[in-house]
């Protein structure tokens, strides 16, 4: 019996010829990631183990991105724990303010993840790297501590759901719309502890930015990981970034899947997920008059250059509605610089937006855009749980950058065609 991409990567890293769903394995990790929320606890647990050095200072990555720049004394102390540990251990990849970016935008850009890798991170959206044909999944801080010490971790081999997306996408439809539609169809637990393998004509034609967005939100369907077959676009993306060898895995024709789901992507409209779950996805055209107070364009889901280009295309020559706050957050310093060079930042500022240094900030209700009681936000982020962006009686709607930009102009949730004719 054949194996899926996910099964092949896990088998290779466990030193086994084959694995099957449900099997418990111990596998070597290529990269272990922590941030300013999760790494302090991992570092504390690491020190309790009595281990003096991490397994490999080039393969432990620390990124202070959630509360950076530090918003208060506590967050400053959290970041200092990372900074001190990185110095003590001689870590190659500690990303300080000025070099920092939102971790899941930053690591692929920096060439730290490649096809066939096994990556664990103490952040649930570590699954983003599946866009590169890697097995990447989120873990807890104690598991991160174990991986930092040993370079290995235990896994239960997941079953895989195969998604095939057929047809050509409509204008303004991107990866965010595909994944919101998918989560709306299968539910937030529809892929619980399963690999989500994305294939089909629409995926072949989807940009790498769109693929990162889809893989990023696999966890929002309960997925263990999201993964894409490596193709020419993948190889082109890593060319000049990844400075080491890698291995490409493809699913066998006779691989076993939990289920196979076919989706006509040509019929998908720009999507909006209503409070308070990502599964509450609707076509933007089905949504009535919903006024908003704030729009956030950015995050590890949609803070890449293509996302900013889409938003700027709609905002060019427009003004943000006087009753709306628009916050734009590029995912990394490199993305910020590229957006500046292309004139995108000027477009945002001229429209009336606030542009921030890279940070997770408002996505988790941390800083840089917290909602007050009764306020509504539309965001290109990945979660809209109760209180996610601030007050428990606020609301968050999820959408892609096109809908977000149009909504910022209209002062209500709006389709891109309402602004760009």
Swiss-Prot record:
Disulfide bonds: none annotated. InterPro entries: Acnase/IPM_dHydase_lsu_aba_1/3, Acoase/IPM_deHydtase_lsu_aba, Aconitase_4Fe-4S_BS, Aconitase_4Fe-4S_dom, HAcnase/IPMdehydase_lsu_prok, Homoacnase/IPMdehydase_lsu, IPM_dehydratase_rel_enz, IPMI_cat. Binds 1 [4Fe-4S] cluster per subunit. Pfam families: Aconitase. [4Fe-4S] cluster binds at residues 300, 360, 363. It catalyses: (2R,3S)-3-isopropylmalate = (2S)-2-isopropylmalate. Heterodimer of LeuC and LeuD. Catalyzes the isomerization between 2-isopropylmalate and 3-isopropylmalate, via the formation of 2-isopropylmaleate. Belongs to the aconitase/IPM isomerase family. LeuC type 2 subfamily. This is 3-isopropylmalate dehydratase large subunit. The gene is leuC.
